[in-house]
């Protein structure tokens, strides 16, 4: 290997270390590591978003705690089963070889029993404290992540995250069903938004890790089609995400005006980063920036949904309508 190639690999490695939380920088106990706790907060945020889209918001504290607690336990179980299934694959990748299972810090039996225990606990909590539909949807999300994405799609197709993203899009349905006992159109809107957001979000990370995926034969889009093709795909899904996010103005029972106004800078920044990556698809720092912002973007959307259901938002809409009617009255005279 010549010096230029070595420098390029070192550069990519340093960028990856900045994007993917390093075990050297943040060491988790083995039992917590396999639960993939970094993924759970965003899943719970979209669950809250699904709740905020219903007329029943805010929920009672017991139901809220049971919904979020059950969701966290199910997500932990899904993470553990994912680690268990991919243990041999992780051993072959430098980035993942020191994880708890491939490094032998935990036994397969222990992780499997923990996953089953978390699944049972989540089911009991949701059935007893929420409702059967919320419990069933949560288990469907777990099944989708472990079986549909991890086992079936991930090792077989570049569209793995497009269809496998359904697992990450189910929490809004759980939130809506927890609040009302059914899933309305607003809940399906947030489901669709997460589905469209997921490929653009994940492919930005996959650009940084494309060599790792290629080395073990995982057909992630950047590894198979290259960064240029992937950046164009990210752009398409990014624009679709922006257009879908605007529909939230109509999905909210109230507060849509404030949501729409506060949404503008989020969408503007997302499109800016997507455009920058499209211009320089091999620039890992741009992929890193887009990946990071995409996470903040979805957290931001959920926060906007919650803010839009406050009394402040209702008063803002009322005052805005009064100002609008006053302007119309002045112009008509």
Curated annotation (Swiss-Prot):
GO molecular function: protoheme IX farnesyltransferase activity
Catalytic activity: heme b + (2E,6E)-farnesyl diphosphate + H2O = Fe(II)-heme o + diphosphate
Membrane topology of this protein: Multi-pass membrane protein
Top-tier EC class: transferase
Compartments where located: Cell inner membrane
Enzyme Commission number: 2.5.1.141
Parts of the chain that traverse the membrane: 64-84, 110-130, 133-153, 161-181, 189-209, 246-266, 287-307
GO BP, sorted A to Z: heme O biosynthetic process
GO-annotated cellular components: plasma membrane
Further facts: Carbon 2 of the heme B porphyrin ring is defined according to the Fischer nomenclature.
Family: Belongs to the UbiA prenyltransferase family. Protoheme IX farnesyltransferase subfamily.
Domain of life: Bacteria
UniProt name for this protein: Protoheme IX farnesyltransferase
Alphabetized UniProt keyword annotations: Cell inner membrane, Cell membrane, Heme biosynthesis, Membrane, Transferase, Transmembrane, Transmembrane helix
Pathway: Porphyrin-containing compound metabolism; heme O biosynthesis; heme O from protoheme: step 1/1
Gene3D superfamilies assigned to the protein according to its UniProt record, in alphabetical order: UbiA prenyltransferase (1.10.357.140)
Protein task: Converts heme B (protoheme IX) to heme O by substitution of the vinyl group on carbon 2 of heme B porphyrin ring with a hydroxyethyl farnesyl side group.
PANTHER family named in the record: 4-HYDROXYBENZOATE SOLANESYLTRANSFERASE, PROTOHEME IX FARNESYLTRANSFERASE, MITOCHONDRIAL
Keyword Transmembrane helix (UniProt): yes
């Amino acid at each position: 290997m010549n010096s230029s190639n070595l420098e390029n690999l070192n550069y990519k490695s340093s960028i990856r270390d900045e994007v993917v939380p390093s075990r050297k920088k943040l060491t988790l106990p083995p039992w917590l590591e396999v639960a993939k706790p970094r993924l759970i907060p965003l899943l719970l945020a979209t669950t809250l978003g699904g709740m905020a889209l219903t007329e029943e918001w805010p929920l009672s504290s017991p139901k809220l705690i049971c919904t979020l607690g059950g969701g966290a336990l199910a997500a932990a179980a899904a993470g553990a089963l994912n680690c268990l299934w991919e243990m041999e694959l992780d051993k072959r990748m430098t980035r993942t070889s020191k994880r708890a299972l491939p490094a032998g810090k935990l036994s397969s039996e222990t992780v499997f029993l923990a996953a089953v225990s978390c699944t049972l606990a989540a089911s009991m909590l949701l059935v007893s404290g929420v409702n059967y539909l919320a419990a069933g949807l949560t288990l469907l999300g777990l099944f989708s992540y472990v079986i549909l994405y991890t086992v079936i799609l991930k090792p077989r197709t570049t569209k793995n995250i497009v269809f496998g993203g359904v697992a990450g899009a189910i929490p809004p349905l759980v939130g809506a069903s927890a609040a009302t006992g059914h899933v309305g159109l607003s809940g399906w809107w947030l489901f669709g938004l997460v589905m469209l957001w997921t490929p653009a979000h994940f492919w930005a990370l996959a650009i940084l890790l494309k060599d790792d995926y290629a080395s073990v034969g995982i057909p992630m889009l950047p590894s198979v089609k290259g960064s240029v093709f992937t950046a164009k795909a990210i752009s398409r899904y990014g624009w679709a995400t922006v257009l879908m996010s605007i529909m939230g103005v109509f999905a909210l029972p109230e507060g849509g005006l404030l949501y729409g106004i506060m949404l503008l800078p989020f969408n503007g920044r997302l499109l800016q980063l997507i455009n920058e990556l499209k211009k320089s698809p091999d620039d890992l720092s741009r992929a890193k920036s887009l990946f990071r912002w995409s996470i903040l973007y979805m957290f931001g959307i959920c926060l906007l949904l919650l803010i839009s259901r406050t009394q402040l938002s209702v008063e803002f809409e009322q005052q805005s309508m009064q100002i609008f009617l006053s302007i119309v009255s002045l112009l008509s005279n």
